[in-house]
Amino acid sequence: MNGEADCPTDLEMAAPKGQDRWSQEDMLTLLECMKNNLPSNDSSKFKTTESHMDWEKVAFKDFSGDMCKLKWVEISNEVRKFRTLTELILDAQEHVKNPYKGKKLKKHPDFPKKPLTPYFRFFMEKRAKYAKLHPEMSNLDLTKILSKKYKELPEKKKMKYIQDFQREKQEFERNLARFREDHPDLIQNAKKSDIPEKPKTPQQLWYTHEKKVYLKVRPDATTKEVKDSLGKQWSQLSDKKRLKWIHKALEQRKEYEEIMRDYIQKHPELNISEEGITKSTLTKAERQLKDKFDGRPTKPPPNSYSLYCAELMANMKDVPSTERMVLCSQQWKLLSQKEKDAYHKKCDQKKKDYEVELLRFLESLPEEEQQRVLGEEKMLNINKKQATSPASKKPAQEGGKGGSEKPKRPVSAMFIFSEEKRRQLQEERPELSESELTRLLARMWNDLSEKKKAKYKAREAALKAQSERKPGGEREERGKLPESPKRAEEIWQQSVIGDYLARFKNDRVKALKAMEMTWNNMEKKEKLMWIKKAAEDQKRYERELSEMRAPPAATNSSKKMKFQGEPKKPPMNGYQKFSQELLSNGELNHLPLKERMVEIGSRWQRISQSQKEHYKKLAEEQQKQYKVHLDLWVKSLSPQDRAAYKEYISNKRKSMTKLRGPNPKSSRTTLQSKSESEEDDEEDEDDEDEDEEEEDDENGDSSEDGGDSSESSSEDESEDGDENEEDDEDEDDDEDDDEDEDNESEGSSSSSSSSGDSSDSDSN
């Protein structure tokens, strides 16, 4: 391919005549030696691997490395090369064993020569003469001229070439039959003539018929000429003519099904499924055309909003398709509730009429067709349930009768970026339409560096994780971004666009220009009301965005984002280590949950200071090991996962700060995490993890000695104990959050517990 087989390389031209002494066994040995010298993970282009091959290691018997290389070049020219060298050698082995099999059948020395076509006979006869007359012409130009000359030949002269061709063709067929008798082993994949032929599609039936007609008029036409002539005619056929071939295809398919069922009974060893027999030969468009002519009713719009849009769009042929739905949505909002209710009733009536007509249509069909239509209706209903109306974003304001909800916009990194930059671009370039603005934002996104994209991808991952954690309606509500704020001019335009479109007969371009001029000529006092509305809309957007980004406290404390392979967080101090030990050994399982934690607190008070120090050292050692494992794990993450983990840690700190209230110890770390989350991921993740651990250590050290009388800490850790009792795996998953809560409660009660600890040390 690509001229490799036709143009011999320097190596081929230099091949000595001694190469003929290679036997089949020697060639197979050569390929086996090459195979043994291939790299274990061979995935490069074959030329690359071939250039690195050590041919001296391939050499065997009295064949040197150079001889082996030359022979390989000769063999490799006989097989396709768009593969790895490993695959190529396997194919070469097959070629050496069966050099004349399959596609290489015509290369067998005994294979009869095919006769030249009438046109090619004429071409070979006249080419030399025309080449002398026009030496400046290329082969391509000569071919074009001779092709034109042949078409202009009278039928009598053409007949001479046709008769010579037919005579030689008969001789070729006799020689071919003789060749097949002499070489039966070379004829592979003989067609099983007893298997019924598969039914044709309507287009195939039409093409076969038209081809016969065309060849009667032009018997010397090539296959390419027939295809070029008939190629586009099928799509230009009228529905009535196409329906004729659809009916013929259906009749042929029924006959095929009956014949195939009889055939399968006679040949039970064949593994042919019922689905393979009954597979339709019609396309979706052809099936719909047939159903339409059979009287199948057209499905009505699914809701009142869709019905309104369908009626409005019939008069909006001049409006660009990208703007039609926007205009429909704006017009729908301007309708009164009474008008919307009228459309709702009209839609319900259309649905009832459709059901009656569909039942009549089904009665006229055979049972198999009834099942097919009912199946299609079921699938349509499933799909339509997900198709919602963009008109009723606030059902409480419109009574909930104006149609279904607007489909949610997909939460993606590019979408978050677009929403963030859209308002700024609208102010900088007000002349751009919505579609032009969207294209510009897409180009801006593509030009962003990977580091900057990672920031938005992290926010995407956080949003998706939040939507997965939230149940039911809350998940749906928070899983999408709030509607972007509108400018004062946009709010004013929405309120008056109906009047302007009516004035300019639905010419949207003229209406927009007129509105723009009116707005520019308005006094500031007149604009003030709309500016206030825009400011309120901006506040609404910022409020909804902050609510969406900030995870709810209850959800954050009960569930956490899971990262595969993240090391398990160890106890933060000696008291937690002591509690974990008692809870895990099952010694206190007979006690209720609260009593169990009280018992742990009392036991902690009773142990000596040296034992407490022992547990503290164990906790510190586990913390050191945890830091090492965490660093290794963070480095092993992909850039996207690392950014998502960083975003999660930052959000977790913010939420914990809100829960704790003002904390002088954590204020520095909180501010640091805020600044880190706003940068473009240029800091090292290891430093962030160390900051997090330092914060945890501070909380742990301050609360360690005060853990003996901290009842709130005991209640927090009781969650861990309960999970340990019911399921050890749940304990592992939620332990991190429990420990954070322990730190919080222990930190808040450190002042009260310090007196208890001092009295305990005095008693000791």
Swiss-Prot record:
The modification N-acetylmethionine is found at M1. Residues 664-674 have a biased composition (Polar residues). The modification Phosphothreonine is found at T201. It is found in: Nucleus, Nucleolus. Coiled coil: none annotated. Residues 677-745 have a biased composition (Acidic residues). GO terms for biological process: positive regulation of transcription by RNA polymerase I; transcription by RNA polymerase I; transcription initiation at RNA polymerase I promoter. Residues 112-180, 196-264, 298-362, 407-475, 482-549, 568-634 bind DNA. Homodimer. Part of Pol I pre-initiation complex (PIC), in which Pol I core assembles with RRN3 and promoter-bound UTBF and SL1/TIF-IB complex. Interacts with TOP2A in the context of Pol I complex. Interacts with TBP. Interacts with TAF1A. Interacts with RASL11A. Binds to IRS1 and PIK3CA. Interacts with DHX33. Interacts with PHF6. Interacts with CEBPA (isoform 1 and isoform 4). Interacts with DDX11. Interacts with NOP53. Interacts with ALKBH2. It is linked to Neurodegeneration, childhood-onset, with brain atrophy: An autosomal dominant neurodegenerative disease with onset in childhood, characterized by progressive cortical atrophy, developmental delay, developmental regression, loss of motor skills and ambulation, absence of language, and intellectual disability. This is Nucleolar transcription factor 1.
